[in-house]
């Protein structure tokens, strides 16, 4: 009986050892899996953080770029408003030039137009105020043209047109014209005018 008990005890001891070994292996494997899972989780967390930082930086740069663009748009809008204001003030001043300034200017603009047309018979057109001034001083007007051009120019006063001032000069048959009205000259030179105003206003 003692022999049988010893055998049973030995079997139990071996079984216990095997159980302990299996449990130890299982525990070790479990720890290993837990460590691997932790490392994977840390790596994933780090990747998520890196991705979030990258996205945040991209978003930050986008916001900054949009803000700069908006500031530039507003700055350009303010500049445009100021330039338009200066041009409108210029138009208003030209439209209300005193006669002693305006008459010599009309002569000069007409001389340039006649030279460009290459004719000595012209029709002049402008707004009612300007045509009235020319009619009132027509002899003087013709004399000033003769002095500047070195020849007599036959000037006919035509119908009024919509303009703030200046002069539109046509050949007598109306086939060719030179538009030296203030409106037209401002329009022709607006690009240069804008550049000059912008430089004066904003440096």
UniProtKB/Swiss-Prot annotation:
Compartment annotation: Cell membrane
InterPro entries on file: ATP_synth_B-like_membr_sf, ATPase_E_C, ATPase_V1_Esu
Single Gene Ontology BP annotation: proton motive force-driven plasma membrane ATP synthesis
Its biological purpose: Component of the A-type ATP synthase that produces ATP from ADP in the presence of a proton gradient across the membrane.
Highest classification ranks of the organism: Archaea, Thermoproteota, Thermoprotei, Desulfurococcales, Desulfurococcaceae
Molecular function per GO: ATP binding; proton-transporting ATP synthase activity, rotational mechanism; proton-transporting ATPase activity, rotational mechanism
Membrane topology according to the record: Peripheral membrane protein
Entry keyword annotation includes Membrane: yes
Principal location listed in the UniProt entry: membrane
Known partners and oligomeric status: Has multiple subunits with at least A(3), B(3), C, D, E, F, H, I and proteolipid K(x).
Family named by the database record: Belongs to the V-ATPase E subunit family.
GO cellular-component term (any): proton-transporting two-sector ATPase complex, catalytic domain
Annotated disulfide bonds: none
UniProt KW Nucleotide-binding keyword: no
Name of the protein in question: A-type ATP synthase subunit E
Keywords of the record: ATP synthesis, Cell membrane, Hydrogen ion transport, Ion transport, Membrane, Transport
